[in-house]
Amino acid sequence: MEELQGYFEKDGSRQQPFLYPLLFQEYIYALAHDRSLNGNGSIFYEPLEIFGYDSKSSLALVKRLITRIYQQHFFLSSVNYSKQNRFVGHHHTNFFYSRFYSQMISDGFGIIVEIPFSLQLVSYLKEKEIPKSHNLRSIHSIFPFLEDKLVHFNYVSDILIPHPIHMEILVQILQCWIQDVPLLHFLRFFLHEYHNWNSFFITQNNSIYLFSKETKRLFRFLYNSYVYECEFVFVFLRKHSSYLRFTSFRTFLERRYFYVKMEHLQTEHLIIVCCDYFNGTLWSFKDPFMHYARCQGKAILVSKGTHLLMKKWKYNFVNLWQYYFYFWYQSYRIHINQLSKHSFHFLGYLSSLLKNSSTVRNKILDNSFLIDTLTTKFDTAVPVIFLIVSLSKAQFCTVSGHPISKPIWTDLSDSGIIERFGRICRNLSHYHSGSSKKQGLYRIKYILRLSCARTLARKHKSTVRTFLQKLGSRLLEEFFTEGEQDLSLILPKAILFPFQGSHRERIWYLDIIRINHLVNRS
């Protein structure tokens, strides 16, 4: 990192540094190698075993990669020429056809393209002296806001952010931020060559898929740039369509490795909250008549207005993606529902508005009368069906919810198997602690517990009943008791037993910075 700072000091222009030469610096790939900068792991760890290398030889591989880039750099000026140069036709010498080298370049690219944004952010924070905002780190921080505001609104729109995105659109978006022409040419060339052999992210139409756990840092960055452009245009349309003048505009920027509060414009009614994509990208803004929130590829738009107004914004989104991003987007993918009659799925919860009526008899002197009171409550429930579908995709149960064994984990020790199942169960309990009714969550715990028992029985070639009798109390403690210890610190008198007591208590945590993987599958 010190070498990187020294490079920009020598460059003399911190706002528009020359980024392309960084591809030939070993410390860039060392930063990509650092797990602290990559929460989802790096290709320098487990994937090295696939190629027959260990972590000790990674430095030699980096040097070999840089040497080959030096040898081929004059071919990178034109994408069309890539099919004619000498290394495309030979699989043994073509590092672009080697998955390992392409992943190294992808991770290095992900570090480099973030540099201009990081430098602008750091300089902006020093100039404004903006304090950190710790409470906004949690994904759960959005739910108290929804509880307070949504009870007064009429309609909600479920929006799916369109993907995949054409790679050329992504490069054009970056041109507004990065003026290093050689780097942009190399990026365009790399994406085209990446498309030729990799089918994880880029389809046959030269488009990039982002909703995969194997997605690399570079593609997460490209997706965030695309979504930022979408929402920037949306905010622009919102400001020009409102008859009310915006008096303030604040942005709370959440990143995986640093989190800060930023003020952008001196323009009380618009707030934007966001964080890194894979840790649960979360945007929301408010005005007197509309609220918007997004988590990864799913967004909701709620309004006090009429159904006609919501249809207007629906076609605004459709036209935005069709004419600005050249993406054919069907209008039926945006659903408009009445909040009082329909529920919506967002952030792993099934949310709805419940209306409760109560009658009170009042008496004044000899006159008595009845007063009917109607109250509206924001309710969040555990989406049991969605979670069962997620568990079935992860091979913990069948589609109908029948627990099955996990054969891929049978090579682990007994304690390792129990610990993995218990950790998943605790994470789900932690994330869904804000549910008003937790009986559905107990069913999920039961599926995981029995799946754990079946996995152990499969490993030891025994029956499930034998292991339930042998480890029944231990499994119960691992899957249920430990998950309730956090709640006992807050509500010690309310919790008597995991299946009884405060199953209706709703608790929002301020330390959840990412969505559980199983929740995200739904």
UniProtKB/Swiss-Prot annotation:
GO terms for molecular function: RNA binding. GO terms for cellular component: chloroplast. Keywords: Chloroplast, mRNA processing, Plastid, RNA-binding, tRNA processing. One of its GO terms (biological process) is tRNA processing. InterPro entries: Domain_X, Maturase_MatK, Maturase_MatK_N. Pfam families: Intron_maturas2 (PF01348), MatK_N (PF01824). It is found in: Plastid, Chloroplast. Belongs to the intron maturase 2 family. MatK subfamily. Usually encoded in the trnK tRNA gene intron. Probably assists in splicing its own and other chloroplast group II introns. This is Maturase K.
